[in-house]
Amino acid sequence: MLYGLRLYAFQEISFLDPWQLAAIFSGSCVLFISLEKRTLTGYMLTFILYSVLALFVSVWLSSAAGKAGIPIEGMVFLLFLIGGICFICLIQKIFQLTPNTVQALIPILFSALFFFLEELPALEGLPLLKWLKGLDLLLLLVGLLLLIFNENRQGGDGEGS
């Protein structure tokens, strides 16, 4: 069995590059936030960790630095992320959405964010881009399925009682 494990090419999965580690951890933060309801503290801590890791990836990958050594793409990304979170909070307050519906909007927010990231010139030609396209579609599908199942669950509760 150990011989079979040695046949895998673990050299291709290199955890020595700091930006790859940051990308893996930021991706796990996205899935952690998207797949289950969290408390406000859990959201804030995970969003802060995700923002710091994403900023690290943008600084590491960019050769052109803006103010304070942070590339302009990184700042646009963070502003888009913070704006999306504020937009979801505003929609929740205006339309009195249930927590399940808000939870379904979070993967859609990240899907829109990754769709936007694909257009940034700093990411052209990186192998990370094909993962962003796949994660974009996966999160969009997860968000839509959560919305559909939430609507079915709400509709089913009122009929049987």
UniProtKB/Swiss-Prot annotation:
Keywords: Membrane, Mitochondrion, Transmembrane, Transmembrane helix. It is found in: Mitochondrion membrane. The chain crosses the membrane at residues 13-33, 40-60, 70-90, 104-124, 129-149. It is a multi-pass membrane protein. GO terms for cellular component: mitochondrial membrane. Signal peptide: none annotated. The keyword Chaperone does not apply. A stretch of 270 kb of the mitochondrial genome is duplicated within the centromere of chromosome 2 resulting in the duplication of the gene. The expression of this duplicated gene (At2g07719) is not demonstrated. This is Uncharacterized mitochondrial protein AtMg00610.
